[in-house]
Amino acid sequence: MAPSRGLQPLHFSEGFSRCRSTLQHQSRNARPLQWSLHARRTYWSFTENLSNPSNKLQSYVSRSSDPYLNLSIEDHILRKSPPDSTILFLYVNRPCVVIGRNQNPWSEVNLSILNAATGTTDLKDTEPPGIGAVELVRRRSGGGAVFHDEGNLNWSITCPRTEFTRDKHAEMVVRALRKQGIERARVNERHDIVLDQGHERRPSDPNDMHRTPYTVDDGVPKPLKVSGSAYKLTRQRALHHATTLLESPNLHIISQYLRSPAKHSIEAKGVESVSSPVSNIGLDLKAYQKRLQDVFATMYANVGKISVTATVDDEYLNIPDIRKGYDELRVRLFNLSVSVHL
């Protein structure tokens, strides 16, 4: 696809007008609440299992590709699960740009491309990549801006706050990758998962999740990032979630969405993203998803067996608490220019 042409720095008055237009477009397309007997049964089954103190280990996979819904289910898990439980949640979103709670979308995202692709503005000087509408979503955790699509598996762990470290579950993911034959995978000093690009194979400890036979200490060639994470802490709980670039068909255009033409003309507070070269891992998503579930079960085998293994889907939007979070994400996204309190 051709890159954007002739983009001008965004002015806030113009930008807010576009945001209102985008918000109206999103509101018109929001799905209605359908509170049926089946939905009530779904609610009680899911929430009862989730909040049951005897269910120390749980594993869920989403069949929905709605980023607002998946993030709202994730938040529901964080707030409703028992304080001493550990829960794995896996999901894949349709194409979207997800920014952190404390980020300024004007300096992190090419809003002109997003608005042109959704048809909310008529920008004749902007040519979006030809993959259709790409939504902008603000998550409740911190961290930087990322691109999601059908080739990216998102993993989420909710656990007791006292057991949380930024490396613990990143190392779990690396173990799963290595079991799939990806021996270059490791956790770096920023707690991201990267693929080492060294040419010479050296001896290394296979149990060390922070070095590989191809780790280069002088940083050349640079490793390629395949997973970036963020987290949210509450009084008793911790949520740690991340992307995993497995087989994204849009790797070549991600930078067009995550590079704002207004970045250098805006002076505002907010967390800036750290740009890194990225790569696909080259694994089948379904096969790796199963492997990750198995590694999670092995990692927590001392706690017991996973007592709940289930799928969630679009009907979970009918759960009032999830619907409330869903509506909050859609409405608040364009409400502030820098960051929000969620």
Where are these regions (language model features)?
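A short, structural micro-pattern
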Residues: Y91-N93, G130, F147-D149, V187, ...
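Contiguous, small/hydrophobic- and glycine-enriched helical/loop subdomains that border
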Residues: E150-G198
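FAD-binding core of FAD-dependent oxidoreductases
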Residues: R139-N154, R190-G198, K225, Y231-L239, ...
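N-terminal lobe of the biotin/lipoate ligase/transferase fold
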Residues: A2-D167
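Short beta-strand-to-turn element immediately C-terminal to the catalytic PLP-Schiff-base lysine
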Residues: I99-G100, D196, L246-E247
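Long, positively charged amphipathic alpha-helical accessory segments at protein N-termini or as interdomain linkers
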Residues: P3-S4, H76, E171-A185, R202-L342
